[in-house]
């Protein structure tokens, strides 16, 4: 024992009374971890609906991306369980396609929970039985730790065989009021079978003398070990032959039987041989692919989920555990088809996990797939990444995840899902489409439930890096990712209907890549990284200023730039405005005025929230401005494409060299991807 008695039950009670230690179940701890800091909860709009973003899940270098609905469902479930609701008798099961982040989310949650419990004020404590040589029936075993990491407060509530005596002890030695004691007893659990058995032995040896009984205990922190599976532990489904209930519950220990005088002592069961006991003291048990387990293990889970008990040969050990599981769609559907297994599903809070459908957020996930380490070729030379690679890969995989809908095209759906402008289509239209799709009884037909997952993206990137073109050119060229994704479709997507849809989606992604390259080429031609952005904003400011009252005969309009706050002058060029609108297919005055009104409306809504908003998400407008500037304003061999394709004269060669130089020094290209991008631009491939 420490000199200050820090390992005694009395000291622990004193710390709980002073608020330095806590007595709470796993759901209360998890709810406090997520909800304690209100500044870490933000209201956001996702797919046209208001929801909450819990910032604790966005902490760390490699944190959870998106999953707003899934996280909200989980937090709601935990909060309900913490408040004594029905969720405390359920498991939270994430069901979805492979590679959509289910396991990553649970692993992140477990990591956050371990970090949370590592703080002194949040530590979990348990107790050891000691001086067992006095009892005499435990052989050479002198110290035994609570097998299920029971809380010292549970020990205090079971200190005497009489509940009233235990309450009197808490009042006298802990200094707790009657209300506080009643609050503790709302979370009352009996001691586990072996702890209760040992406790009775100690009571008999000590003649029920409380002071003597207390000398046989010491309070210790629960070890926070990821590798040992304490506090957070994972059980992955195994094949039918090697798996057994022992993996979850534990089994009889021959070594212990050699020491124990009484063969009926429940301590003969080594519970820590199983995964559940190691997380029984306020921990999280993660069952990966729960419905892949054979039937007897599923029945074990049914008992554990419902009763929160480990049960062997009639002996019971109450546990304080949050059970989270995952399953892929096919295994879950197969399991549902077996009607006799319905009770376990009835005890689960099923959460269907969709793929990420926000291409802006997908760019973070694509970075995860590419990796943070510096890439090298097979000959150990530095491997450059095309600045358009992330965008190309992200839009391609996101488009495969978007279902077909009559009200929206796939591009409109993608833009709206990312919170961007999609012509005249509003976010409400997307919300309506999602609502209709989410009423489908077939889960895979719901919004975002089917498509290329993160693992498929990883495979495509691996295929890209292993090609001779990538290694010889020392660059991961963006256009090549489409070929790699098509290879993944042929090799890994077995259903013909899905494969045909995904090929169409990748074709659409190629078209978007083409438009991106048009913009990049214009920026390179103008020797300015944001040239097209400036021209787009010129058009927007011109159509706002064209009806201004203070517009003089010289067509000069002065306005305050919302980004810098400075006063700027702009000459209204009606020819330029008309050219852009012709490219947009606006032929009548009514059509033009309607489009201008929509742009002004967007400007008013967006600029007030984000002064840096630049309309670059409006694909049609950006494309029209790019076309006007590239195909109308540029002299030379008829167009920029002609000039770059025909470099037989000095002027065209100088233009080519200047653009290559700009791409190398200002736009983040290497010589390989700069040359390949210009070559692709000149071929007119993937033009809509």
PLM segments and residue spans:
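Conserved ASCE/P-loop NTPase catalytic core
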Residues: 1, 7-688
């Amino acid at each position: 024992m420490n000199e200050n008695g820090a390992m005694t039950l009395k000291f622990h009670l004193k710390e709980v009374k002073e608020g330095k230690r806590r007595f709470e179940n796993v759901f209360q701890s998890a709810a406090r971890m997520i909800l304690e800091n209100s500044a870490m909860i933000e209201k956001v709009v996702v797919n046209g609906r208001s929801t909450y973003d819990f910032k604790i899940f966005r902490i760390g270098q490699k944190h959870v991306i998106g999953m707003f609905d899934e996280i909200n469902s989980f937090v709601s479930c935990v909060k309900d369980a913490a408040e004594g609701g029905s969720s405390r008798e359920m498991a939270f099961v994430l069901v979805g396609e492979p590679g959509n982040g289910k396991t990553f989310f649970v692993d992140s949650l477990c990591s956050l929970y371990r970090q949370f419990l590592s703080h002194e004020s949040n530590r979990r404590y348990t107790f050891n039985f000691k001086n067992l040589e006095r009892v005499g029936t435990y052989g050479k075993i002198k110290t035994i730790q609570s097998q299920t990491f029971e809380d010292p407060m549970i020990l205090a509530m079971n200190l005497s065989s009489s509940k009233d005596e235990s309450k009197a002890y808490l009042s006298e030695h802990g200094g707790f009021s009657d209300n506080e004691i009643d609050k503790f007893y709302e979370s009352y659990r009996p001691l586990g079978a072996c702890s209760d058995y040992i406790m009775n032995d100690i009571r008999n040896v000590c003649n029920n003398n409380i002071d003597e009984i207390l000398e046989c205990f010491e309070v210790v922190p629960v070890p926070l070990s990821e590798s040992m599976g304490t506090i957070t532990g994972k059980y992955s489904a195994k094949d039918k032959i090697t798996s057994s209930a022992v993996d979850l519950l534990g089994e009889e220990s021959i070594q212990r039987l050699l020491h124990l005088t009484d063969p009926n002592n429940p301590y003969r069961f080594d519970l820590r041989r199983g995964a559940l006991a190691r997380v029984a003291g306020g921990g999280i048990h993660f069952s990966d692919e729960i419905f892949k387990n054979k039937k007897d293990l599923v029945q074990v889970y049914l008992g554990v989920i419902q009763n929160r008990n480990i049960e062997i040969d009639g002996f019971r050990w109450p546990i304080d555990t949050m059970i989270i599981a995952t399953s892929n769609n096919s295994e879950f559907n197969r399991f549902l088809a077996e009607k006799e297994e319905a009770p376990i599903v009835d005890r689960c809070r099923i959460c269907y996990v969709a793929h990420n459908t926000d291409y802006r957020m997908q760019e973070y996930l694509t970075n995860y797939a590419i990796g943070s380490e510096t890439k090298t070729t097979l000959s150990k030379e530095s491997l450059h990444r095309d600045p358009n690679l992330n965008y190309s890969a992200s839009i391609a995989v996101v488009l495969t995840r978007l279902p077909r809908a009559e009200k929206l095209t796939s591009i409109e759906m993608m833009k709206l899902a990312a919170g961007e402008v999609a012509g005249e289509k509003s976010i409400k239209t997307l919300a309506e489409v999602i609502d209709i799709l989410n009423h489908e009884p077939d889960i895979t037909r719901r919004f975002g439930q089917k498509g290329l997952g993160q693992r498929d993206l990883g495979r495509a990137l691996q295929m890209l890096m292993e090609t001779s073109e990538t290694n010889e050119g020392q660059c991961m060229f963006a256009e090549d990712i489409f070929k790699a994704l098509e290879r993944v479709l042929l090799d890994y997507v077995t259903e013909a209907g899905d494969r045909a849809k995904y090929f169409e989606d990748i074709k659409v992604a190629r078209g978007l890549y083409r438009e991106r390259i048009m913009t990049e080429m214009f920026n390179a031609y103008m020797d300015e990284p944001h040239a097209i952005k400036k021209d787009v904003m010129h058009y927007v400011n011109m159509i706002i200023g064209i009806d201004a009252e203070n517009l003089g005969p010289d067509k000069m309009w002065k306005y305050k730039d919302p980004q810098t706050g400075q006063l700027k002058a702009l000459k209204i060029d009606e020819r330029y405005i008309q050219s852009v609108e012709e490219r947009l297919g606006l032929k009548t005055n009514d059509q033009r005025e309607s489009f201008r009104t929509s742009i002004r409306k967007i400007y008013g809504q967006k600029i007030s929230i984000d002064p840096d908003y630049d309309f670059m998400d409006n694909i049609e407008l950006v494309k029209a401005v790019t076309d006007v500037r590239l195909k109308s304003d540029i002299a030379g061999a008829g167009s920029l494409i002609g000039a770059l394709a025909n470099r037989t004269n000095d002027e065209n060669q100088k233009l080519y060299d200047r653009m290559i130089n700009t791409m190398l020094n200002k736009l983040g290209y290497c010589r390989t991807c700069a040359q390949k991008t210009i070559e692709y631009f000149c071929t007119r491939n993937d033009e809509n």
